[in-house]
Design a protein with these regions (language model features):
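Structured beta-strand/loop patches that form or line metal/cofactor-binding pockets in enzymes
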Residues: 36-81, 87-89
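Solvent-exposed, charged interface segments at domain starts and junctions
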Residues: 1-14, 78-90, 137-142
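A hydrophobic, small-residue-rich beta->alpha segment in the mid-to-C-terminal subdomain
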Residues: 82-122
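Intrinsically disordered, low-complexity boundary segments flanking structured domains
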Residues: 30-32, 41, 132-133
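Charge-rich, low-complexity N-terminal segments
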Residues: 1-37
Length: 154
């Protein structure tokens, strides 16, 4: 399989979405889901390595950017024996998490993408959405409704 032809068929936004999902996924959950998928052979293009990145922020989300602080990340890249290439960047020092994320990224560019999506990405997306809704429900429960009463004084 020609990796160049395969890579051109993939929508960039879709790939960014699944790579973000894999990076945010809890490592134990991703490892558990990976057990249901046949692990393909691969060679390392870049073994997992730990480094730091500067995290930038903006005041109010729209202001001038500023350096918020540094964060540890692990990155890697690999090529499946069938030619597909996968990349991963994950927060923290978990090399196994980065490897699993890169494997899924590579498999999503190959012929088994629909099976990998059903076995790995869909459960991760469902769990992430459920956690988001639970967090929103907890926040909603603490919401205070303020109101103004008209006083009889002139």
């Amino acid at each position: 399989m020609n990796a160049t032809k395969t890579a051109t068929k993939i929508d960039t936004a879709e790939r960014q979405a699944w790579m973000g999902l894999l990076a945010r996924a809890p490592a134990p959950r991703l490892a558990g889901l990976m057990r249901a998928v046949a692990r393909p052979g691969f060679t390392w293009l870049r073994r997992p390595e730990v480094g730091g990145v500067m995290v930038r922020g903006r005041t109010g989300g729209t202001g001038a950017p500023f350096n918020l602080g540094e964060m540890t990340v692990t990155r890697c890249a690999l090529r499946l024996d069938t030619g597909e290439v996968g990349h991963a960047h994950v927060q923290g020092r978990d090399k196994a998490h980065a490897e699993a994320a890169a494997l899924v990224d590579a498999m999503m560019t190959g012929p088994d993408a629909s099976a990998v999506r059903a076995a790995v990405l869909d459960p991760l997306a469902g769990a992430e959405q459920a956690a988001r809704l639970a967090r929103a429900a907890r926040a909603e429960a603490t919401k205070v409704a303020f109101f103004t009463m008209v006083r009889g004084e002139d």
